[in-house]
Curated annotation (Swiss-Prot):
Chain intervals for the UniProt region annotation (Amidoligase domain): 1-270
This protein's name: CTP synthase
Residue positions binding ATP: 13-18, 70
Binding residues for UTP: 12, 191-196, 227
């Protein structure tokens, strides 16, 4: 097993995750099996209970792990399915160590950060790296991204563990990539001083960098690379320019041009086979159409809906269609806003805020035949809207958000659950598809697997009444409703699951493909 450690300096939010994912893609393009581990130095066990407006999207893995959005990027770039073990948090590590101490595993030792915490971190990294995620076989290379910034107190135990692993591994089995900011001064010149200080801080911890990735608004010139090489004692071919790209999926190609893959192959003594051009063909496909999709959201931060944005782009690229997203505040959205869109998407969420705005948006799309895709909460509210305005239950609601007639109720297994973290219906669940439906047309099979994250479901007592009134439940898990659709509508489709989490640039999600195609047809009618 070979390891590539990715650290960050100067400031957070530089794109370490995209850099790590892009490195993985470069090596995958050369025929290697690549996995990835994300270290998040916070005390939370996982991302499941975090405020999305602060933390961003909670990405759901196939085994139900609620993790940082960077793991979504890993899955999309590398075309793999990761497990909960691939996200290591301070909370997880401390809980493991404390559990061992309580069991007496340490045989009376004084439990300390070094060696007990650092040993546990190394065990977690190795265990995740050796997961057999490739048809029963482990990966050839593991990329380990250390969250946070060099110098943060929270990251210190993890950086010490990286230092130890670097010493324990053979030279050809490890490489360290440091992502750092290259700011411009008032004259537009790129400044190297912050990077020099960041490299110095790493060296003071006993960690020596092999490659520097300079994040900047414009490419690094040869003079800047030569200066960094001299001052940071790194060969000039190890100074990689990473200017801001218009499309994140083009970052691997930009790093390829900079020689990143060749340098890593040299460091890790890997064969330098030619790169598979499939990725290039997919991400450079030209657009011949353009559509606007409105997302009726309650959170102002776009990162909350990252996987939805990417799934729309995957479908759009497959159909040579550029997707422009219009963000519509669920508490302020007006009918005119919706009518200006070629289609409307109602995403998942929690709580009562913005609920009525979303329901009103669903009604307008149903009545005015605007393509609509509802996800999770969007599925539940589609049922509520139908119950109110077609079935005639004026006070229909979800028991999560109202005191009326609850056509959406809590899952039986969720009753009495006290802890919020890790207790929802999470991860992969099978869904049976009904023949002759939109769902079957999209998936072309009778049973599918999709990822879930919810506590509420359609009340079984109302299913037959809803179906008699024209709502088709085309996907089920036993007596649990999973997909709802309407006949004689351009595209009215809602899922209890989250299809966006399984979408890839190489294989777009079927519901998103169908939705974008319907939006494209809807736009064509108005032209």
């Amino acid at each position: 097993m070979k390891y590539i450690f990715v650290t960050g300096g100067v400031m957070s939010g530089l794109g370490k995750g995209i850099t790590a994912a892009s490195i993985g893609r470069l090596l995958k393009n050369r025929g290697y099996q690549v996995t990835a581990v994300k270290i998040d130095p916070y005390l939370n066990i996982d991302a499941g209970t975090m405020n999305p407006a602060q933390h961003g999207e909670v990405f759901v893995l196939h085994d139900g792990g609620e993790v940082d959005l960077d793991l979504g990027n890993y899955e999309r770039f590398l075309d793999i399915e990761l497990n909960s073990s691939h996200n290591i948090t301070t909370g997880k590590v401390y809980r493991m160590v404390i559990d061992k101490e309580r069991r007496g595993d340490y045989l009376g030792q004084t439990v300390q950060i070094i060696p007990h915490i650092t040993d546990q971190i190394k065990d977690c990294i190795r265990s995740a790296a050796e997961e057999k995620v490739f048809d029963g076989k482990p990966a050839d290379i593991c990329i380990v991204e250390v969250g946070g910034t060099v110098g943060d107190i929270e990251s210190m135990p993890f950086l010490e563990a990286v230092r130890q692993m670097r010493s324990e591994l053979a030279t050809a089995d490890r490489a360290l990539v440091h992502v750092t900011l290259m700011p411009s001064d008032s004259m537009g010149d790129l400044k190297t001083k912050p990077t020099q200080h960041s490299i110095k801080a790493l060296r003071e911890l006993g960690i020596f960098t092999d490659i520097i990735v300079g994040r900047s608004e414009r490419p690094l010139n040869s003079h800047t690379k030569k200066k960094l090489s001299s001052l940071c004692d790194i060969p000039q071919n190890g100074i990689i320019s990473a200017a801001t790209a218009p499309d994140i999926y083009q970052v691997p190609m930009e790093l390829e041009k900079e020689g990143m893959a060749d340098v890593l192959c040299q460091l890790l003594q890997l064969r330098k086979d030619g790169a598979d051009p499939e990725w290039y063909r997919i991400v450079t496909r030209e657009y011949t159409h353009r559509i606007t999709i409105g997302i009726v959201s309650k959170y102002g931060k776009e990162d909350v809906y990252l996987s939805i944005k990417e799934a729309l782009r995957h479908a759009g690229r497959k159909l040579s269609t550029e997707v422009s997203i219009r963000w519509l505040d669920a508490e302020r959205v007006e009918p005119a806003d919706l009518r200006e869109c070629d289609g409307v998407l109602i995403p998942g969420g929690f709580g009562v805020r913005g609920i009525e705005g979303k329901i009103n948006a669903i009604r307008l799309c149903r009545e005015e035949r605007i393509p609509l895709l509802g996800l999770c909460l969007g599925f539940q509210l589609s049922v509520v809207e139908f119950a109110r305005n077609v079935l005639g239950i004026a006070d229909a609601c979800s028991s999560e958000c109202g005191d009326g007639t609850a056509v959406i109720t809590i899952l039986p297994e969720q009753e009495g659950v006290e802890n919020l973290g890790g207790t929802m219906r999470l991860g992969d669940c099978p869904v049976e598809i009904k023949s002759g439906t939109i769902a079957y047309k999209l998936y072309r099979q009778h049973e599918i697997i999709e990822r879930h994250r919810h506590r509420y479901e359609v009340d079984p007592a109302y299913i037959s009444r809803l179906e008699d009134a024209g709502l088709i439940f085309s996907g089920r898990n036993g007596n649990r409703m999973e997909i709802a659709e309407i006949e004689d509508h351009p595209f009215f489709f809602a899922t209890q699951f989250h299809p966006e989490f399984r979408s890839r640039p190489t294989s777009p999600s079927p519901p998103f493909l169908g939705f974008v195609e319907a939006c494209l047809k809807n736009r064509g009618k108005g032209e």
